Amino acid sequence: FPDARCAEIAATETPSGIVAVARKPAAAAAPAGNADCVLLDGVQDPGNVGTLLRTAAAAGIRQILLAPGCADPWAPKTLRAGQGAQFLLDIREGIDLAAFLEGYAGQGVVTRLDAPATL
């Protein structure tokens, strides 16, 4: 594949030179109410979402729930930051996190940028 053609069709400024076509994996029927998971709420930067997905995959967490308003986990910049982690994860988009947490039986750790205190 010529570099010029790759640069022409790439969605990023510095394409890696690798081109592939892949299907978006189907999510399971319903989020598990007790599995380890990462919940993302309001994370709008594609690079940050990709990094969080990559970190979750490295930690062995497979379920990722994104609230409305998060960056698209399948956007080119998110895929690049995720380095393929998306294909190891069960990613759910548009999740009502409050409703999910009502039935969640696992333990949780909450972090937020605007919290009044640190952990």
At which residue positions do the language-model features occur?
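RNA substrate-binding interface of SAM-dependent RNA methyltransferases
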Residues: 2-7, 21, 25-116
